[in-house]
């Protein structure tokens, strides 16, 4: 190519460089979507771009970058507030001191969202909560090889979202001191691994509205205590026995409970699980998945007077009696969703007898409108009994949808005809049997 053509192409590029003419706020928003290393590379484009990257409000670094480069990038930052900083650090590459310095710089930049994951085989990184008197921090996400060591209450007055993903804790007091200093906390996610570092994990947060607690640790001595008077949404995945205490949740609207435990003392477990249900009577939406064959008992007179949507996983035989109990105790229930196993069960315990309610529940007579049954087999006798009972007695049912993607089309048609043979209480009910997975 001749020199003349080179000059012509260069002139054409400059004439077509329309992106540089965009408002600075829009350019910064665009740059925020790019990897930080690419954002820094834009400084060579022109004089205008030379310092623009220093104003980008969101930064992300990982262990592939040199610590000096990360430090220089943070120290060069000129935006009034650092909106978000993501750090993925390998402790085999970065020392705990270096990681601590980077976190300290972030606090000095008035960071609003800090995400820190530490990997590697070296000692756990102790998060510097002594630096946490930070009025700007609104979201804090900590994961993996981090230990929470908080000898005295922190001061995180603006923190609204806290996510503790598999981190460790020095002791019970560290949990209390961390949460007690988060006076505006609304969203809390806790993922506990098989750690025996905390005996009583107390979640006492007056402002908390959403809680997701996953407890993979099976330490019999560990206890979870939930005391959150403003809590509206609860998701618990762990052992539903006397190690889980829900003490004060009067505002609870939605709860999802998944029991992954194997109980040694069935009598105690029956009562405790019943007490847990008894503490959820204010909910409007409830999902239950139990793993053990329990004879469910909950306190006499417990009424789910607000419950409009119920989801039950029908993996265990006692779920059917739990269903009877819940129908009797939920007078305004409108939506019922049952979720079965994906594949057919051949174990005889699945064929136990269902004890249907003595009287037709009020919700079936007056309120239930939608039934969804996912992975309906139609071969297990108890399933057929329950399905036919619901169709025969639900006066205002508008739609009943069954599905199973794991049986042949001719079998699905056979199941549908069997269900259609039932004399239904509702004249306007639409009965459907689908192949694909369905949701409410």
Task: Indicate where each model-derived feature is located.
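Leucine-rich repeat
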Residues: 2-5, 10-204, 363, ...
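A structural signal for leucine-rich repeat
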Residues: 100-105, 128-134, 151-159, 175-183, ...
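Conserved hydrophobic position(s) of the canonical leucine-rich repeat
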Residues: 56, 82, 111-114, 137, ...
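LRR N-terminal entry segment and analogous cap-like coil->beta motifs
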Residues: 57-62, 77-92, 109-119, 137-138, ...
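C-terminal helix/juxtamembrane-tail motif
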Residues: 1-4, 405-440
């Amino acid at each position: 190519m001749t020199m003349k053509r080179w000059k012509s192409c260069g002139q054409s590029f400059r004439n077509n460089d329309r992106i540089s003419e965009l408002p600075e706020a829009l350019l910064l928003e665009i740059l925020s979507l790019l990897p930080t290393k690419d954002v820094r590379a834009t400084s060579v484009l022109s004089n205008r771009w030379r310092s623009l990257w220093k104003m980008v409000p969101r930064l992300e670094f990982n262990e592939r970058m040199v610590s000096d480069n990360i430090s220089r990038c943070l120290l060069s930052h000129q935006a009034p507030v650092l909106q978000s900083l993501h750090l993925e650090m390998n402790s085999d590459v970065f020392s705990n001191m270096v990681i601590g310095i980077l976190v300290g710089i972030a606090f000095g930049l008035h960071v609003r969202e800090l995400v820190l994951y530490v990997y590697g085989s070296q000692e756990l990184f102790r998060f510097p909560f002594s630096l946490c008197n930070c009025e700007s921090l609104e979201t804090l996400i900590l994961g993996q090889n981090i230990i929470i060591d908080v000898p005295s209450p922190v001061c995180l007055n603006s923190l609204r979202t806290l996510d503790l993903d598999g981190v460790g804790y020095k002791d019970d007091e560290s949990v209390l001191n961390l949460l007690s200093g988060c006076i505006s906390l609304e969203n809390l996610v806790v993922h506990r691994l098989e750690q025996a570092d905390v005996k009583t994990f107390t979640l006492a947060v007056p402002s908390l509205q959403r809680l997701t607690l996953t407890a993979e640790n099976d330490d019999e001595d560990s206890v979870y205590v939930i005391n959150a008077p403003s809590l509206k949404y609860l998701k618990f995945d762990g052992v539903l026995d006397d190690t889980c205490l829900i003490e004060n949740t009067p505002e609870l609207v939605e709860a999802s409970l998944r029991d992954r435990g194997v109980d040694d003392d069935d009598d105690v477990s029956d009562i405790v699980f019943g007490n847990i249900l008894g503490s959820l009577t204010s909910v409007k939406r409830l999902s239950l998945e139990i793993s053990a064959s329990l004879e469910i008992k909950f306190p006499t007179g417990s009424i789910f007077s607000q419950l409009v949507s119920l989801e039950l996983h029908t993996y265990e035989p006692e779920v059917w009696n739990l269903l009877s109990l819940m129908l009797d105790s939920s007078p305004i229930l409108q939506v019922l969703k049952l979720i079965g196993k994906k594949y057919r069960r051949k174990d005889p315990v699945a064929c136990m007898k269902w004890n249907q309610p003595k009287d037709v529940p009020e919700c079936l007579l007056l309120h239930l409108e939608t039934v969804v049954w996912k992975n309906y087999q139609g071969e297990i006798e108890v399933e057929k009994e329950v399905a036919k009972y619901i169709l025969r007695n639900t006066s205002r049912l508008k739609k009943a949808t069954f599905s199973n993607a794991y049986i042949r089309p001719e079998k699905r048609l056979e199941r549908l005809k069997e269900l259609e043979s039932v004399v239904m209480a509702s004249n306007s009910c639409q009965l459907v049997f689908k192949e694909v997975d369905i949701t409410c």
